[in-house]
């Protein structure tokens, strides 16, 4: 039976005009052909993207499902390309992100552009969804911390870990550890002067002291020193550590002060050790060297690593910084860290905002 005779028979049986049935059939096969050709989903990360954070979440979801994925560094803000699957396309729609379904020959053209030696772009295969841990007190809610809030919004799964989990050897369970608002020196963020009578500050101090005692330490600074050393072991074992704000400088300060008492009496009940600041061991540090501790224990500053108060006073409308344009083909990791839909970024103020370049170890990027 020919196709035409079959169509006429179907049209009579179901009271559908032959012309309408023909249009439906042609449309069906055209759709099949387009589906066969459209083999990639491109998630642009430039200004045209409706939701950048959720786009990262979709990329994570795709990798966790075993979907082939590539990160196109410096191509339209660091776009993602993935093997086309209906489930992936549905996920893109559900999360409200911008995406494009492109043909294989179109993607081949994109790859040719990226591979051009004269173009500062590179392709990175994404093969494993990292297991993420965020170092944060268990009492903190996702909206209390910018990191957990961003991950929660992006729908990227993570676990909270804190001092007990670190000391219990749980870090090797993860690929990535994130540190944010933290003080590894045992000085409780140096919030004493402004917040010593605040209920939240007193509760955090009491909880830290209970944890220290339960772990056999007489001081919180000793507890934090042990935690810092466990984190260093995690990094030495191949773990990725991403630190922000006060976690950056306070971490290296804690490593440099192993076995020393750099805390004054309002933080640990007794004065700092004699000449403790002059006995710091910078060889223990990951990133910084030759820094000087801030002598006033009531000052909201740990050391001269941070240049928040010395980089020059800027108004909010004047505070911007530009992302460095690394070589994508040679410096892949720093290029990944600088992927963004904007090159000029609005400034911000933190306890640790920017670093004194003279105090960064020469082997550090």
Task: Give the label of every model feature segment.
Residues 256, 265-267, 276-277:
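Catalytic cores of eukaryotic secretory-pathway lumenal/extracellular enzymes that build
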Residues 1-16:
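N-terminal secretory signal peptides that target proteins for export/translocation
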Residues 37-145, 154-156:
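Hydrophobic targeting/anchoring helices
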Residues 145, 152, 249, 260, ...:
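Catalytic beta-strand/loop cores that center a nucleophilic Ser/Cys/Thr
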Residues 17-31:
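Bacterial N-terminal signal peptides
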Residues 40-41, 46-50, 80-90, 140-248, ...:
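Helical hinge/lid and interdomain linker segments adjacent to catalytic or ligand-binding clefts
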Residues 69-75, 161-164, 266-268:
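Surface-exposed patches in mature extracellular/periplasmic domains of secreted proteins
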Residues 4-8, 34-39:
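Generic start-of-chain signal for non-secretory N-termini
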């Amino acid at each position: 039976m020919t196709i035409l005779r079959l169509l006429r028979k179907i049209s009579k049986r179901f009271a559908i005009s032959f012309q309408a049935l023909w249009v439906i059939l042609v449309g069906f096969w055209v759709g099949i052909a387009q589906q066969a050709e459209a083999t990639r989903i491109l998630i642009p990360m430039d200004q045209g993207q409706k939701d950048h954070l959720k786009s990262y979440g979709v990329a994570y979801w795709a990798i966790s499902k075993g979907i082939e994925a590539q990160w196109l560094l410096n191509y339209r803000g660091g776009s993602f390309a993935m093997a086309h699957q209906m489930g992936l396309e549905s996920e893109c729609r559900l999360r409200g992100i911008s995406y494009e379904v492109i043909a294989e020959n179109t993607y081949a053209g994109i790859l040719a552009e990226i591979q051009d030696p004269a173009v500062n772009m590179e392709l990175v295969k994404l093969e494993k969804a990292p297991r993420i841990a965020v170092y944060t007190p268990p009492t903190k809610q996702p909206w209390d911390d910018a990191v957990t809030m961003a991950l929660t919004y992006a729908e990227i799964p993570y676990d909270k870990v804190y001092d007990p989990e670190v000391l219990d050897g749980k870090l090797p369970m993860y690929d990535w550890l994130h540190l944010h608002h933290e003080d590894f020196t045992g000085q409780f963020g140096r919030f004493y002067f402004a917040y010593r009578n605040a209920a939240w500050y007193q509760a955090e101090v009491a909880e830290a002291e209970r944890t220290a005692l339960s772990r056999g330490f007489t001081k919180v600074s000793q507890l934090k020193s042990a935690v810092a050393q466990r984190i260093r072991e995690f990094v030495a074992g191949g773990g990725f550590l991403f630190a922000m704000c006060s976690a950056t400088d306070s971490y290296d300060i804690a490593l440099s002060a192993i076995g020393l008492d750099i805390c004054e009496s309002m933080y640990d009940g007794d004065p700092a050790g004699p000449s403790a600041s002059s006995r710091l061991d910078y060889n223990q540090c990951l990133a910084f060297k030759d820094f000087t501790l801030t002598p006033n224990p009531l000052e909201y500053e740990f050391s001269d690593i941070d240049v928040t108060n010395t980089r020059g006073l800027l108004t909010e409308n004047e505070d911007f910084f530009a992302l460095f344009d690394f070589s994508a083909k040679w410096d892949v990791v720093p290029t990944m860290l600088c992927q963004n839909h904007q090159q000029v970024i609005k400034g911000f103020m933190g306890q640790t905002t920017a670093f004194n370049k003279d105090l960064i170890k020469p082997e550090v990027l």
